[in-house]
Swiss-Prot record:
The lineage of its organism: Eukaryota, Metamonada, Diplomonadida, Hexamitidae, Giardiinae. Keywords: Cytoplasm, Nucleus, Protein transport, Repeat, Transport. InterPro entries: ARM-like (IPR011989), ARM-type_fold (IPR016024), HEAT (IPR000357), Importin_beta (IPR040122). Lacks the importin beta N-terminal (IBN) domain. Transmembrane segments: none annotated. HEAT repeats lie at residues 1-36, 37-82, 83-132, 133-175, 176-222, 223-269, 270-316, 317-377, 378-416, 417-453, 454-495, 496-540, 541-593, 594-642, 643-704, 705-756, 757-811, 812-880, 881-932, 933-978, 979-1027, 1028-1074, 1075-1120, 1121-1151. GO terms for biological process: positive regulation of gene expression; protein import into nucleus. Functions in nuclear protein import as nuclear transport receptor. Involved in encystation process. Constitutive expression enhances cyst production and increases transcription of endogenous genes involved in encystation. Level of mRNA of the transcriptional factor myb1-like protein increases in early stages of the encystation process followed by increased mRNAs of the cyst wall proteins cwp1-3. It is found in: Nucleus intermembrane space; Cytoplasm; Nucleus. It comes from Giardia intestinalis (strain ATCC 50803 / WB clone C6) (Giardia lamblia). It comes from the Eukaryota. This is Importin beta. The keyword Transport applies.
Amino acid sequence: MDLASFQNLLQQCQTEQDTQKRKEVEDFYFKYKQEEPASYVANIIEVICSNSSSSNYAAILFRRDMEQSGDVAAVYRAGNGNPECVHEVMVRILNTMLGQTSSNSIRFLSEILGVHLERILESDPQGGVAQFPEFFQALETHFAAPTTTSQLRVGFLNCIKYICGLAYTSVTKIGGKAIIDLIFAGLEDQADTVAVAAIKCVNALILYGDSDDEDEKNDSVIPNSVLQQFVYKIIQRLPAMIGRHNFMDAEQALEQLVDIADMNGAVLKPMVKDVHILVTGILSPPEIDDSLKRLTIVLFSYLCENISDIRKRAKKAISEIISQFIFPYCGLFDDTLTQAWLTSEDPHHFDDQNSLLGYAESALDRISTTLGYKVIFPLIKDFVSYAKANPTVHNCFAVANIFTITAEGLARLVTKEDIVFTIDTLLELSNHPHQRVRYSVLSAIGQLSEDYAPTFQTFHEKVMPLLTKMAQDPCIAVAAHSLGALVNFLEHLKKAETYLYKDALEPVITMHLMQSNHLLSNTNSLALVASLSNTLLKNDFADMCKNYIPHILGMFTNVMETLRKSPNMSLNKPRLSYISRILECLSIVAGTLPQLFAPHIDPLLTAIMELFNFSIDDAESSLLKYTLIAVSRIVDIYPETFPKYMDPIIAKLNDIFNLKYIEFDNVNEFAVTDDDDCSFTISPHVLQLQAVGFDVISGIMRKTPAAFAPHLDAFLTKIQDRSFHTGSISESLKLNSIECICTAFRVAVAAPTVASPPAVHQRAFTMLIAATESNIDDIDIYQSIADSMAEYVMDYCKYITSTKDMTSYTETVNKVFSLLENFEDQCRKLLEVSIQDLECDDDLDPEETATMVSDTVDDFSDAIATFADVYGTFAEALGDLSLDFMSPLLMPVIKRWVNYYTSTKKNGISGAQVAFLTSAVSILADIVKYLSPANSKSLVEPFVTIIIENTKLNKEWVEINQVCCYTAGLLFEKYEGDPGLAILIPTLLANATELIGVVKSGELVSKEALAAYDNAVTLSARMAQAFPTELGNMSGGLTQFWASWLDLASTVQTDREEVIASIQLIISAFARNDPNFMSGNLVHALYAFLSLYFGDHHISIVEDQTNANLIEGANTVLTQIAGHGTILADTIAKCSEYVQKTYSLYTSVRQ
């Protein structure tokens, strides 16, 4: 192709607008470049070095060729691998740059030279200099020459930027001092554009800075002393740029400084005062451009995040900037747009996140998390006082907004008094005349309901009336938003307390769901209906939903009709949220009320299958994600309906699992942009979608295993081929795929002729082992894997007991124990490293360090407890068959954990020690519970002493008392009549009585303390059942003992298992007409029975099929007591409102 034809081709690539013709032109261009590389390079170099209108465009295309091909292949192809040809081309480009006056032309030419310099210097710095001496000679001759234009100096610095991107070792070999001096000269240049180019060089160098400021002799890093000189000059230079109102160059310089603070904030440590002056100097004057203020806010937030001891160095300066600028900026919504806000479908995301408001919100979120409660909350209280004295709309908005933004960062240490202050402030603001302020109050309540839960919910008497009142706000956006806050608040509110407001909630839902066409009203009312499914009794929820289901189904019908008319339509976030809430509400109602919803389930699933086919313009795949979540809910409740929908679901999931979450950007060769480097993109939405897909699969495998069996082999192959279980960068995707692997054996057992259980076990177990051997650096991941393993162990062991197929039994058991031991070792190491890092973090004060260490130890404790669950699963699933490996494998684990507690106890008790003791005892409890007394006794006997000792009240570690009281109770239940237990009764009764008394007094109020209380109460009852004479002698007679116990039993509420145990005990006493219950203690017994059976756990008890005998016994008791005159009605009247409500529903159903 001759030069004229090539120039014409370039012109067409640059200007052609017709899509089809443009594609033809581009295809021709690519074909020419591939088939005639020598001609292509010769022509494009001619264009680059000419003065044609296409020269800059050609320079961009050629640089991309150089960068994307890896070895400057475009040039080398032209010379058939001859470096001299490359050299000639680059010298020509250099000479062309030296003769230019246009800044754009110089920029594009310098970028080509920069890429070339980077390539020849990165592997051999000194040899690379020899390959291109002309450049370094020109640099020395021209850069400092008085006649050199600022544009050319910028071009040279653009080239130097690429050299600075190499490791500092390479820079020093090239001539480090000369390059450093050159950058210093650029920073001091009179032209701001030159200074900006020099700052970009500093930014490239900063990647190799020494953040510890200790080792200045290591030539692989730039000493901080040099970097700090650079940064100091940048900070000095910026005010002059801004003073000249050269905001464009100042913005570029500030962007680079922000990057430096982000990558190596320690460099700024000696300049905190200078940065403070710079920040205030930019934020104070009103005439300074907002773009600079936005960047300055980011700079300040990075300063707070990345300088370890910033609070000690500059607490006063930080406080001033937060109070004077960050807080007020959090109220700067654009009031001129309020009318548009009122009609917006998405008022919650209406404000521009690129405004000062958006930047301030983001910065305050980071700052509050970094600086913490002790710095931020006092400033909030001061700002509230300031806003009260200066109650502008923006100040009032800022107050509520600040509470919202800082909630997560302050949650660790916030006190009840702080929450009261916060609620009272919000109550006052809730009456503000401006809609935006009232809306922000609701945003704050919604966020605080999550971050300060459950303490925040203890003030429901203040918050709930406010929310139900604001649901009737004259501004529909505010009224609708109140429902969102209600959903968050109710999520952590106790069921009994929710019932206090049920009558106020129903008209709110009716108004916003049935009587409003406002999108946000409909969306949030659907969410509120869904949230009440877990709170209300089924009958109450059914009564509510009878009116709502037809209306919600009508909503869904309208959505489907709209999508059918425009299957490729674009849906904004509010519309997507609305559809997702419909799907959520319908699937939850279907799951909660299967009989009521049964007529609608097939049409719903049919419509959901149709949703799979719509190509909605939604980059985040939100609608597909919500559809899959709805499917996962429905499969749990309607497994018999599901198999006929299996094929389209599996087909869609296969499409999802084939998606790539990482894509290399195919840069459009013909698009001219400032940032046009080749890169790759990770799509979190694909990862989320695949994680949800595995969640759906695991539900199908559990609920319809036989129907899934034909797909199992292909599914496991997909996991292996894509390495979801070993190589995924998404924790949830990895864990969900492992959960599916652990469920595979259940599928094989359900359909052994389709999927051979031994073969599936061999494959799935091998995959599980591979997953555990992949890189894991988080305690939580080990815990989650162990949680999935418990399910696998249960399914596998049940199969062994039913089939006696011992093919790989011993090998499997040994490997599980080996894996768990390795998990334990790895978690210990991670715990030690995490604690060491926290204790060495200078940015944390002692109280924060203690809190974070405690949280980390809690994670470790949860992991050890989960490992104990896996060990205990063997006992539960195998019973006495587990004896084969109990002594050689499990008992050493228990001994090791107990010994760790006892041997280190003299040095004080830590959370980790407690975890090992409680976990060891919980395994012993499983052995007692699931093995026969004859086989379990010898295993447990060596540990009885430590169990009994630790029923003694330990106020600091009451969870020890909880598990030991529970296990001691099991000993009396399983080994009833054993004379060795009788001698323990005085000690145990004294310990239980002390624990009960302390908790009852209110001295201990934690969840663990309340559970320990429940266990102590049932322990005393189990001792009385096993040894009634001994207990009667110690308690003033059995009648007196049971009278006292029944009063205590009525208050058992935390531990569901102990609630059930207490109910069973009372039922059995009624069944045998025990005089200790049926005579003088009848009222006590009935009150305790009603409080327990119709209390907080009533719903979960009656919906659990394993409790059929208990439910039948409870019905018998109520029938039996009905013949005792008015005693039942009188006793019910003394019970709580919630108990009365549940009892009333029970009687109405029975009638």
